[in-house]
UniProtKB/Swiss-Prot annotation:
Species for this entry: Karelsulcia muelleri (strain GWSS)
Keyword hit for Phosphoprotein: yes
Phosphothreonine sites (modified residues): 197
Biased amino acid composition, Polar residues: 604-618
Biased composition (Basic and acidic residues): 619-630
Protein name according to UniProt: Chaperone protein DnaK
Sample GO molecular function, one term: ATP-dependent protein folding chaperone
Function: Acts as a chaperone.
Region Disordered, residue ranges: 604-630
Superkingdom of the organism of origin: Bacteria
Induction trigger: By stress conditions e.g. heat shock.
Family statement: Belongs to the heat shock protein 70 family.
Keywords associated with the record: ATP-binding, Chaperone, Nucleotide-binding, Phosphoprotein, Stress response
Length: 630
């Protein structure tokens, strides 16, 4: 069986790992880095850049540089109004209230943008392994709902991957932490604060079994929010000092975002940092510069509410697992934002123990995903993962009530059935509305799908027996069926939210993604060929200048003709002609080296003859002693 790679598809950064024997390996990307920024840039001419190359040009191309797309995955446009305030690129309302990224005259779904990041991860693994990769385990925040999980799976399919399993990020981290601790029985907490989401999971480890006891979280809390409080502070301070509002300047905002992220990182190891942004904007009076010192104490004050927000899910998770903080043996910190000292301090205070620093918070999730891939492929044995569904699942019943069929923190996969009936006499059809959440009224929760059961046998209200079955697979994705027990009539759906994509749309996007990959490869090949042409032109002109007098006029003329032809091909970007003239010039240069060598040998021989004749002439001269006569 081919390798199943593990991908951590993050809000800020992504990472890919593979199993090598019994050990997981984090795979460096083409830039030599172990994590890749989850950033896509659309360049003039149709080229796309992914990762660090995209991040480097963000300041000069803010409207076409896409970041934090994970925050829009599987969500409706009406749900993302706050997120829209924090991005310089354009997102508009698409069909069925879906968010669409607008680039020029083309619209992209969040799944398509995420697929571009996944393609980069796929290519990174393929370059390392030396063969094509088709299967992957992809991680999601534990608190992702069904629609967000479906969207992640769709992104994988668009990228050309068979998504063998969707796994929760804290669970993946626990797998990575506990793989070599099979003989230890422990209760561990995984506190996972990533770029855009926060999760808390409590697991029990022992004898190769990883059982999730409870999970909670906040899908609107992450490192981006910590950056935002710094940005807001800078904007406010600059407006007071200079009277200029930077929040509406997309290029200035992008510079503020980069500086805020750097300041946050520096304050993890320093007590203060200087934010220096010359020429941040200009007014009629001249250019304006932003120079501010941010102390760790001020940053902690700005982010205090965010840190407190992360503790509420911690309380909920403990309560759901019927544990208290003293029952916890180990606390694992995951996600780059957990490097913030105040977070470490608050987590230690809450759980009454020092968090473990034995794992790399940026890499541990992808490592766990690779281990799960190894379990699925049979490379990793004696490991059993028992995950849970993060939110309750149910249907709408009479009066708009949300009736739960599966409670939150139920171990998956699982299946549950209940009998319902009609609300009116002789009702021939019912609409089953499926929801996910913890509120008592259906409309206060997230509707994740609906379908109709028709041709119900006429009967007084309350008589028909309609069996509704919920079936959650190991990916946490839901299938729902409804059956009229008197007629045997059955209707079922694999839940696909309004933000989901049809099979035809996924196939179309897969095709477009491959075409874009081919297009990018063509652009890359074109650049490489032009670079080769420039190198050959330089070398040939240098050879003509240095050795032009040592080759025949015929050879010299051939070189000059083909050199001019290569320059024309290079300027017109004609790849086939560039290859043709490079080959011709290389062949001519090869023969010219022989001419140069022969000329050099001839010169050496002539010098040798002259030296010999000089020696012979000198043989008749004898050395004698002489005495000066005075």
């Amino acid at each position: 069986m081919s390798k199943i790679i593990g991908i951590d598809l993050g809000t800020t950064n992504s990472c890919v790992s593979v199993m090598e024997g019994n050990s997981p390996v984090v795979v460096p990307n083409s830039e030599g880095k172990r994590t890749t920024p989850s950033i896509i840039a659309f360049i003039e001419g149709g080229e796309t850049k992914v990762g660090d190359p995209a991040k480097r040009q963000a300041v000069t191309n803010p409207s076409k540089t896409i970041f934090s797309i994970k925050r829009f995955m599987g969500r409706n446009f009406s749900e993302v109004t706050e997120e829209l305030k924090n991005i310089p690129y354009k997102i508009i309302k698409g069909e069925n209230d879906t968010p669409r990224v607008s680039i020029g005259n083309k619209l992209y779904t969040p799944q398509e943008i995420s697929a571009m990041i996944l393609q980069k991860m796929k290519k990174t693994a393929e370059d390392y392994l030396g063969n094509e990769v088709k299967q992957a385990v992809i991680t999601v925040p534990a608190y992702f709902n069904d629609a967000q999980r479906q969207a992640t799976k769709e992104a994988g399919e668009i990228a050309g991957l068979n998504v063998e399993r969707i796994i929760n990020e804290p669970t993946a981290a626990a797998l990575a932490y506990g793989l070599d601790k099979n003989n230890q029985n422990k209760k561990i907490v995984v506190y996972d604060l990533g770029g855009g989401t926060f999760d808390i999971s409590i697991l029990e480890l022992g004898d190769g079994v990883f059982e999730v006891l409870s999970t909670s979280g906040d899908t609107h809390l992450g490192g981006d929010d910590f950056d935002k409080v710094i940005i807001d502070w800078l904007v406010k301070e600059f407006k007071v000092e200079q009277g200029v509002d930077l929040s509406n300047d997309s290029m200035a905002y992008q510079r503020l975002k980069e500086s805020a992220e750097k300041a946050k990182i520096e304050l993890s190891s320093s007590t203060k940092t200087e934010i220096n942004l010359p020429y941040i904007t200009a007014t009629p009076s001249g250019p304006k510069h932003l120079v501010k010192t941010l102390t760790r104490a001020k940053f902690e004050e700005l982010s205090d509410d965010l840190i407190k927000r992360s503790l509420y899910p911690c309380k909920n998770a403990l309560k759901a697992s019927n544990l208290i903080s003293k029952d916890i043996d180990e606390v694992i910190l995951v996600g780059g934002s957990t490097r913030i000292p105040k977070i470490q301090e608050q987590v230690e205070k809450f759980f009454e123990k020092i968090p473990s620093k034995g794992v790399n918070p940026d890499e541990v999730v992808s490592i766990g995903a690779a281990i799960q891939g190894g379990v699925l492929s049979g490379d990793v044995k004696d490991v059993l993962l028992l995950d849970v569904t993060p939110l309750s699942l149910g249907i709408e019943t009479l009066g708009g009530v949300f009736t739960k069929l599966i409670d939150s923190n139920t171990t998956i996969p699982t299946k549950k059935s209940e009998i319902f009936s009609t609300a009116t006499d002789n009702q021939s059809a019912v609409t089953i509305r499926v929801g996910q959440g913890e509120r008592s009224m259906f409309n206060d929760n997230k509707e994740i799908g609906r379908f109709d059961l028709i041709d119900i046998a006429p009967a007084p209200r309350g008589i028909p027996q309609i069996e509704v079955t919920f079936d959650i697979d190991a990916n946490g994705i839901l299938n729902v069926s409804a059956k009229d027990k008197s007629t045997g009539k059955e209707q079922s759906i694999r839940i696909q939210a309004s933000s989901g994509l049809s099979k035809n749309e996924i196939e179309r996007m897969k095709k477009e993604a491959q075409e874009n990959a081919d297009k990018d490869n063509k652009i890359k090949e074109e650049i490489e060929k032009i670079n080769s042409a420039d190198s050959i032109i330089f070398q040939t002109e240098k050879q003509l200048k240095e050795y032009g007098n040592k080759i025949s006029e015929e050879t010299k003329k051939k070189l000059e003709i083909n050199l001019n032809n290569l320059k024309d091909a290079r300027n017109s970007k004609n790849i086939s002609d560039i290859d043709n003239y490079i080959n011709k010039i290389n062949n001519i240069l090869s023969s010219s080296y022989q001419e140069i060598y022969k000329n050099n040998e001839s010169v050496k021989n002539n010098e040798s003859v002259k030296n010999n004749e000089s020696v012979k002439n000198n043989e008749s001269v004898k050395d004698v002693d002489f005495e000066e006569i005075k």
